[in-house]
């Protein structure tokens, strides 16, 4: 039985600067993610144009280059279904990471950071808070 190597670490974090509740609600509504089965997935630091594929068992959600905006620290965001596991494949590193539905739980925001130095270059942060874009 092949054991898949884990290329990421996970944490839950809510103690950072966030937007107001009102702004957060509007953001979720604009992305049609204001119901329990959806969350927003963010790619943040460390992405330099590499092609990323995001999928679940129902659909391919996103396939494109992802580049971090140096001023905001954000790269790309999208709505995902939290009732399904989400697979993220980085074509540059040929590594797959997973946002597991049981880990997401009630969290509305999932941030993925990349730092190619270590054995686990990706950090997944589950949060109830939306970080400001500025």
Language-model segments: which ranges?
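Terminal leader/tail segments of proteins
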Residues: 1-134
């Amino acid at each position: 039985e092949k054991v898949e190597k884990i290329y990421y670490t996970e944490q839950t974090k809510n103690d950072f600067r966030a937007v107001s509740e009102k702004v957060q609600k509007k953001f979720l509504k604009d992305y049609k993610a204001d119901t329990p089965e959806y969350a927003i997935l963010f790619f943040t630091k460390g992405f330099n144009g590499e092609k990323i594929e995001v999928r679940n068992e129902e659909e391919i959600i996103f396939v494109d280059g992802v580049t971090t905006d140096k001023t905001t620290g954000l790269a790309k965001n999208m709505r995902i279904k939290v009732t399904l596991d989400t697979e993220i494949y980085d074509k540059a590193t040929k590594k797959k990471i997973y946002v597991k539905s049981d880990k997401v739980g009630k969290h509305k925001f999932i941030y993925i950071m990349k730092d190619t130095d270590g054995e686990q270059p990706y950090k997944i942060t589950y949060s109830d808070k939306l970080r400001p874009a500025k």
